[in-house]
């Protein structure tokens, strides 16, 4: 298990005021999404298909040898997302 993030929170009205929240990822999730390799693990692939090439959350491009940030395109052939208004997704409720 890998620690992905750590968050501290304070609740003023409680006797035990402070809390710590850990965001954890398993080794298999870290490999699948980011491409971090772990030695002596028999089967790292868990979330993506076995024929899948690459790692979806990895920002480093091996061809240009640097981190590449690209805008996310949410359009699909059968659907166009309009993120300006949450009510545009429900035309029957206008």
Swiss-Prot record:
Keywords: Electron transport, Membrane, Mitochondrion, Mitochondrion inner membrane, NAD, Oxidoreductase, Respiratory chain, Translocase, Transport, Ubiquinone
Catalytic activity field: a ubiquinone + NADH + 5 H(+)(in) = a ubiquinol + NAD(+) + 4 H(+)(out)
Entry's localization field: Mitochondrion inner membrane
GO molecular function, one term: NADH dehydrogenase (ubiquinone) activity
Membrane in keyword set: yes
Protein's membrane topology: Peripheral membrane protein
EC number(s) given by UniProt: 7.1.1.2
Pfam family, one: Complex1_30kDa
GO biological process entries: mitochondrial electron transport, NADH to ubiquinone; mitochondrial respiratory chain complex I assembly
Class in the EC hierarchy, top level: translocase
Family: Belongs to the complex I 30 kDa subunit family.
Known role: Core subunit of the mitochondrial membrane respiratory chain NADH dehydrogenase (Complex I) which catalyzes electron transfer from NADH through the respiratory chain, using ubiquinone as an electron acceptor. Essential for the catalytic activity and assembly of complex I.
Subunit composition and interactions: Core subunit of respiratory chain NADH dehydrogenase (Complex I) which is composed of 45 different subunits. Interacts with NDUFAF3. Interacts with RAB5IF. Found in subcomplexes containing subunits NDUFS2, MT-ND1 and NDUFA13.
Protein's UniProt name: NADH dehydrogenase [ubiquinone] iron-sulfur protein 3, mitochondrial
Organism field: Mesocricetus auratus (Golden hamster)
């Amino acid at each position: 298990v890998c620690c992905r993030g750590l968050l501290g929170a304070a609740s003023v009205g409680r006797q035990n005021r402070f809390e710590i929240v850990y965001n954890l990822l398993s080794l298999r999730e870290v490999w699948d999404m980011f491409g971090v390799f772990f030695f002596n693990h028999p089967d790292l692939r868990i979330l993506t298909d076995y024929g899948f090439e690459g790692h979806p959350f990895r920002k480093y491009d091996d061809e240009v040898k640097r981190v590449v940030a690209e805008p996310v395109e949410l359009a699909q052939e059968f659907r166009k997302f309009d993120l300006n208004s949450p009510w545009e997704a429900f035309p029957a409720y206008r």
